[in-house]
């Protein structure tokens, strides 16, 4: 039975109760079934009529003890769902009465409410304000707390700890009436206001305007009192200056011809908006057609800025529309992006939902560059604008139609999801708490569906739900206030949430059911990549613990195994996308997830090298090399992974090298040290030349193949926007430190590589290990 209150559920509940009463109805009334119900044991044994007296005539005449069986009444067998539904119905009706009558119903006892009903039944005409005024004296009576208000709390807790409910109930009964009215403060909630132009803005509960509105509604007779209403000002707009006009004209001149714009729009909606929502395609094409149909159109700068970003991102993913196409050139769509930046000041000044849409797309565009801080700033601007427009709250304003509400919800959950995913990837705090968001999840609205296009509403829902879990991971596992808690328990709880998310996926999103020809194939694969990434993020902190401790509890081993399997599986999904030409060299999540999983696999190779890891790394290198062709950030990730791999191969070779050869090297070193005491100049010179001087591949025995690994780092790459000479010097300096006489490479004292590391606070895992809760890649290199 559904728990939501609706007329349909009411009818179902009524029919269920009728059926239950019918099942309990006996064909013969209970009072007439005397021989079955009222016969004593003696009469029943002798099969004679019993008159039901105590004692009966038969027992009295025979001087026998007259005993009747205990009546076994059938207990009420209502289900838990029934009481939950009934409790919700009660709360809904109570809320309606409180809104209509402005009276706290829960402060009245049941006899008082019965008295109110009796009195108002005699009134021919009745106003809502008169309902409880007719029984004002009942407000002075003792006000009990109705047990029905406990609702699901009673059903779920009374079996576990009956004292909890009893204590809460007693506290409510003994509470002072004035204390019970404190929850009236909760009426001061945030609200969304819509002006005459249709622009919305959010007013939080702590704002002065919200308090003015409360005073106005509670104390004033006329709610349209002009002097107070003047406080509710609309957003002022300034006339455009010369720079603004020139920016609009430049954007209009950059609009591509219809054939090109149609191609770019198709590319954007097919690859960028697959798991998110930014703007409705039908509305976009309609407004674009209006602009193209007039010579000097009056254009909204916000929509024009959004249009430029759609064309910019469509240009980025254009190569995926033609599978045989090679990557075009660096920074595709840069002209559109630069023009959108010129328009952005006007869009910020307007602060409409178009600012939310344009700024989040700007952040996405910059994710494929090395301007990561700028990208994060655009994401923050997008979320702030969304909150300013009230997208994060449930909208009950009658001035906003249902379709607009649905589009607002879809946009909000896309912004929310992006905030969670980017915050996790960059290690930055979440921008908004879940407790502040009560906007409804998206739903399928037939009027908003596009004929001939696959609906991605379920993808938005699935991404929003897993983003919530990743947000919990950030708060509970990586939050600074949780270092004293047991992370193993937290990880297992989060892992259970992930499994529940996976079980709730609709059939067409299950990995085994995916079809490469489905328009949402890439989007659905991304859902499962995000699932694997969530496992990696929540279980990665125990990897170093696993390496440092030979003996671990089964719980730690299980979490470690989950992390390794998730990393391999994620790389296999990346390889799947690459095989079907669905891997984008400009997608942040494609290269970031590949980089994250490759780190885990390489770390596992140190302790337990296996063929599965070698295959996974081949796939990872292939994908990173492909994405590095047009993505500066991906190129950076590929460099770091190869540096990481080269060092770990050196560590493995030093640890697993030929014992005789290692002994020979130790003997030679000892001879040199002893002889140096007598003839330092004669003996130390050839020793330094043969052991410490040469840095070619032959001198790196037993790791003779290391030269090939280091050769992956080109020194003539001019497209890498970091300090190229410094990075390549770092790589050469790193290669020179790989001395075979060392059992562990000395990265800890390499100041050039320490620049990659961050200082982090440790935490206690199972009360015995102080590890790095936020491990950088250097922590994996030097476990």
Swiss-Prot record:
Establish whether keyword Zinc is in the entry: yes
Keywords, comma-separated and alphabetical: Cytoplasm, DNA-binding, Metal-binding, Nucleus, Transcription, Transcription regulation, Zinc
Give the source's domain of life in one word. Eukaryota
Among Gene3D superfamilies, the record links this protein to: Zn(2)-C6 fungal-type DNA-binding domain (4.10.240.10)
Which InterPro entries does the UniProt entry name for this protein? Fungal_SecMet_Regulators, Transcription_factor_dom_fun, Zn2-C6_fun-type_DNA-bd_sf, Zn2Cys6_DnaBD
Q: Which GO terms describe its molecular function?
A: DNA-binding transcription factor activity, RNA polymerase II-specific; RNA polymerase II cis-regulatory region sequence-specific DNA binding; sequence-specific DNA binding; zinc ion binding
Supply the SUPFAM superfamilies for this chain. Zn2/Cys6 DNA-binding domain (SSF57701)
What this protein is called in its record is Uncharacterized transcriptional regulatory protein C3C7.04
Q: Which organism is it from?
A: Schizosaccharomyces pombe (strain 972 / ATCC 24843)
